[in-house]
């Protein structure tokens, strides 16, 4: 800037009379060192605010020209978090990779995570990198989940956490959760009732694909709260729900598909050639149509209420998240140029992210319990002792959020399951400015991968880290460790400003469902052991579906 000012003044100098020009030139020659000094000082201050050191990030070996480390992650059978874990064993808890033009910082210790998400770094690491999937299926920068950190995102976050997912609002929607969980358990009992023998008094174990049932349950619970979908709805409504569910399932599959353009934008033609771009565009259109129809139905419902001059829902109508969002939008509190897109993006984010995360945690938790029958027996003893035999006599025991604090072993089981098998093994962010992490300089635009899976198995932090041991969370050492982002050694829901806003909701559903399963069913693995292999992909899915032998429990 100082150079440009001097250059501009020289042009002015040649336009002035000689005497005046001489005075101006003398003045500039005197002033220019001062200008240059302050410009350099300002740059230095900016540099000092963001980067105390200039030590570059250590880079893993094996990078190729142009594509960088891409080939290390091209084996479709390898799990990225495991590959990165092996690299951390070699390079330490902080190192970098290159993918095309993108530099990626990889951290795998709680100390490094704390550096990234405390102080000024927390704000700098509050962006998520965009991707082909986000651009084509999730409204790009207007998506709640992927919008850049700034006023727009903060307003959406405020709406989500304070007006949709606050404790007060969750209490208001409590009857919807319980209703859908009840409906799902009734379906499960119906499956088992078909296997009665001996004059309809003796149950024979029924083989049930539990990961499918978990998906059914979580979609119904979240769909009911977000958009009013009911699992026992009439045929027309059920058809809409099925379209919704199919679109969400397609999103999950496409999100797990590698897009070349996310790494090397100039090679975007490969994604078009393979058909990935077209599939994502079509899926995005389906999602927008389904969510748009739901929003329009809710708008018509509000107009009907307005025309009737009642100002309130009838006894047959329920308020859900979309209703709340539309009310906020009417008060002009939804930010951005397209408030309706904001409403749709919030609904879509909750339906897609919430359903997958909760289903996966349930699936891994039950898998672990079936492979450790001694721990399942301890959980059963706690549940039976707390609720008593009386509530097992019918198939609709009252399990409420208020019961959770008393079920300490159930809480420990779910924590330990999320420690070993987090729903998302990698947490991804991007820095908006230069910063320092671990004594290294991190340039602006660097992507961040937090290897949650590796960090939560750190032997420095966890004794016998590969062992499923819920008792560790009952000890004085780990008893106070929480999963809501404040204890950096255990962050299954993330941490920092972009921590999952639905963590409390997910935990309530997890405790409710696991407790009822243990209360109402005897559960066994059909072939002795459950296969615990994980499938590569965006979410931490199992390779083999979870088939379980279920027998309803009865009084002795």
From Swiss-Prot:
InterPro entries for the chain: Cyt_P450, Cyt_P450_CS, Cyt_P450_E_grp-I, Cyt_P450_sf, Plant_Cytochrome_P450_Monoox
Keyword terms, alphabetized: Alkaloid metabolism, Heme, Iron, Membrane, Metal-binding, Monooxygenase, Oxidoreductase, Transmembrane, Transmembrane helix
Binding locations of heme: 500
Record pathway: Alkaloid biosynthesis
E.C. numbers: 1.14.14.166
Expression across tissues: Highly expressed in capsules. Expressed is stems.
Source species, domain of life: Eukaryota
GO biological process terms held by the UniProt record: isoquinoline alkaloid biosynthetic process
GO molecular function ontology, one term from the record: heme binding
GO cellular component, one term: membrane
Main localization of the protein described in the UniProt heading: membrane
PROSITE patterns xref list: CYTOCHROME_P450
Membrane topology: Single-pass membrane protein
Transmembrane segments: 18-38
Annotated SUPFAM superfamilies: Cytochrome P450
Catalytic function, reaction form: (S)-cis-N-methylcanadine + reduced [NADPH--hemoprotein reductase] + O2 = (S)-1-hydroxy-N-methylcanadine + oxidized [NADPH--hemoprotein reductase] + H2O + H(+)
Cofactor names: heme
Subcellular location: Membrane
Family: Belongs to the cytochrome P450 family.
Task performed by this protein: Cytochrome P450 involved in the biosynthesis of the benzylisoquinoline alkaloid noscapine. Converts (S)-N-methylcanadine to (S)-1-hydroxy-N-methylcanadine.
Name under which the protein is recorded: (S)-N-methylcanadine 1-hydroxylase CYP82Y1
Species assigned in the record: Papaver somniferum
Taxonomic lineage from the root: Eukaryota, Viridiplantae, Streptophyta, Embryophyta, Tracheophyta
């Amino acid at each position: 800037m100082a150079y440009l000012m001097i250059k501009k003044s020289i042009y002015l100098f040649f336009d002035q009379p000689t005497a005046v020009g001489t005075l101006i030139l003398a003045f500039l020659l005197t002033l220019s060192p001062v200008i240059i000094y302050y410009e350099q000082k300002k740059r230095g201050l900016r540099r000092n605010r963001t980067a105390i050191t200039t030590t570059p990030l250590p880079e893993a070996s094996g990078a190729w020209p142009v594509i960088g480390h891409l080939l290390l992650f091209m084996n479709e059978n390898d799990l990225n978090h495991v590959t990165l874990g092996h690299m951390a064993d070699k390079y330490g808890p902080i190192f970098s990779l290159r993918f095309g033009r993108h530099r990626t910082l990889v951290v795998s210790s709680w100390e490094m995570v704390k550096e990234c998400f405390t102080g000024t770094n927390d704000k700098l690491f509050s962006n998520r990198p965009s991707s082909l999937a986000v651009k084509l299926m999730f409204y790009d920068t207007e998506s709640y989940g992927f919008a850049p950190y700034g006023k727009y995102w903060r307003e959406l976050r405020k709406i989500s956490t304070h007006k949709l997912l606050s404790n007060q609002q969750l209490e208001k929607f409590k009857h919807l959760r319980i209703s859908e969980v009840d409906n799902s358990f009734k379906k499960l009992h119906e499956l088992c009732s078909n296997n009665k023998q001996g004059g309809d008094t003796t149950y024979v174990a029924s083989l049930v694909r539990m990961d499918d049932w978990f998906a059914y349950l979580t979609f119904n619970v979240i769909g009911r709260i977000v958009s009013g979908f009911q699992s026992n709805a009439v045929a027309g409504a059920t058809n809409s729900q099925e379209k919704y569910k199919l679109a969400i399932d397609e999103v999950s599959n496409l999100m797990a598909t590698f897009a070349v353009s996310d790494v090397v934008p100039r090679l975007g033609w490969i994604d078009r050639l393979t058909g990935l771009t077209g599939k994502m565009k079509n899926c995005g259109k389906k999602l927008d149509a389904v969510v748009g129809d739901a929003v329009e139905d809710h708008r018509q419902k509000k107009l009907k209420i307005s025309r009737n001059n009642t100002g309130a829902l009838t006894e047959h109508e329920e308020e859900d998240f979309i209703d709340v969002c539309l009310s906020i939008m009417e008060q002009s509190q939804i930010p951005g140029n397209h408030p309706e897109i904001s409403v749709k993006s919030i609904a879509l984010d909750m339906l897609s992210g919430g359903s997958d995360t909760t289903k996966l945690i349930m699936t891994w938790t039950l898998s672990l319990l079936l492979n450790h029958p001694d721990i399942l027996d301890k959980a059963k003893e706690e549940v039976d002792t707390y609720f008593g035999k009386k509530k097992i006599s019918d198939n609709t025991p009252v399990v409420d959020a208020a019961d959770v604090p008393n079920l300490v072993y159930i809480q420990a089981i779910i924590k330990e399951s999320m420690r070993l098998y987090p729903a998302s093994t990698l947490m991804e962010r991007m820095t908006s400015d230069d910063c320092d992490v671990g004594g290294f300089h991190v340039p602006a635009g660097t992507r961040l991968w937090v290897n949650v899976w590796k960090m939560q198995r750190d032997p420095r932090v966890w004794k016998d880290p590969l062992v499923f041991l819920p008792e560790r969370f009952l000890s004085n050492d780990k008893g106070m460790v929480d999963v809501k982002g404040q204890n950096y050694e255990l962050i299954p829901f993330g941490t920092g400003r972009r921590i999952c806003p639905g963590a409390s909701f997910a935990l309530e559903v997890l405790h409710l469902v696991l407790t009822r399963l243990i209360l109402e069913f005897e559960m066994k693995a059909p072939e002795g052991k459950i296969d615990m292999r994980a499938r590569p992909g965006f979410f931490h899915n199992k390779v083999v579906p979870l088939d379980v032998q279920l027998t309803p429990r009865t009084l002795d």
